[in-house]
């Protein structure tokens, strides 16, 4: 029987090799071996996605490769999901996070990974999807009263819209009732500080650890 390290390494390989079948197999193998699904995702699937993302930024991989890697990860996650849902039903929600990719931006891979990781970590996630109008973030904040609103921007031309979330939350009179978090490829801590966001998420694991720190 393969060791935990070998199974996690295979999970990473499944993503970097764009192998959906292997992703499903290794997810089943991990569950059978009693490996913590969160560890499998963080050290296997997410690590693989980060490697693919880096190669994409360097120009050695292209968008179809990134999409294929994301599909492989989604396939593996589907296998793990029932176990995660079972765990969630046994523990109360740790808090609510509204998340979405900002208006004008159709990219959702990074946001999808973050949403999955938060879900797995025990938070209730309200995923608004991609190309989300600013007013939708605000309306959803009024409706579900989350602790955190997280927006992702994958382009410099759309990250400016993150300023509007801050402004419109103030106009709605609810800015002081919620923490805001920003992330995405062009987004930095300096940008978060400049626009007045409470938190900056550099990676999926960074987001989870910072959300935990704020809410727990």
UniProtKB/Swiss-Prot annotation:
InterPro entries: Cbl-bd_cap, Cobalamin-bd, Cobalamin-bd_sf, Corrinoid_p, Met_Synthase/Corrinoid, Meth_synthase_dom. Methylcob(III)alamin binds at residue 107. GO terms for biological process: methanogenesis. Acts probably as a methyl group carrier between MttB and either MtbA or MtaA. It comes from the Archaea. Pfam families: B12-binding (PF02310), B12-binding_2 (PF02607). Keywords: Cobalt, Metal-binding, Methanogenesis, Repeat. PROSITE patterns: B12_BINDING (PS51332), B12_BINDING_NTER (PS51337). CDD domains: corrinoid_protein_B12-BD. SUPFAM superfamilies: Cobalamin (vitamin B12)-binding domain, Methionine synthase domain. It comes from Methanosarcina acetivorans (strain ATCC 35395 / DSM 2834 / JCM 12185 / C2A). This is Trimethylamine corrinoid protein 1. Residues 1-92 form the B12-binding N-terminal domain. One of its GO terms (molecular function) is methyltransferase activity. The keyword Membrane does not apply.
